[in-house]
Amino acid sequence: MTTMTDTLTPQDQSTGLVSKFKTYAPHAIAGVASLVFLDSLRFKFTNAPETQTIFGKLNEWAASFGAEGLFAQTGLFSQYVIGTAELVAATLLLVGILPAFRRLQAIGALIAFAVMSGAVNFHLWTPLGIDPNNDGGGLFFMAVVVWFTSAGLVFLRRKELAAIFAGLKTTLFPARS
């Protein structure tokens, strides 16, 4: 007795795998990024010592060029502001798993990419360094993982993002008659 897969050519089978990858990879990526973001919230929103160390070092660095308070608890880039952005990104990534809300996943991926671009750059180019909490660089590694996964998700959801930006353009700059 032959099965359906016996009658498929290798090309048909690989096309099926590509289709499954395109369908399920964005959900897996969204899940990974969301888990990292949601796990970090317990540190940011409870003012954990690890968070105090990180944002304290960043605030000292900012003060060295006249931007004291930038990373303080009431600053523009405080742990609460960053944590809220991560919460919004995680929510959009997870809600975007539902087919009717795919565009939200694309927006969540952009927010995640932006937040993690900042995190990775601050780890690399400020006195914060890649191991501010003596955790072997685990925090930095997770930031890099989320940065890459969110970049991948932005790529996979590029059509949705193009539609969003086209709609914004039409709304903000209506055609003149």
List PLM regions with ranges.
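Membrane-interface extramembranous regions
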Residues: 2-177
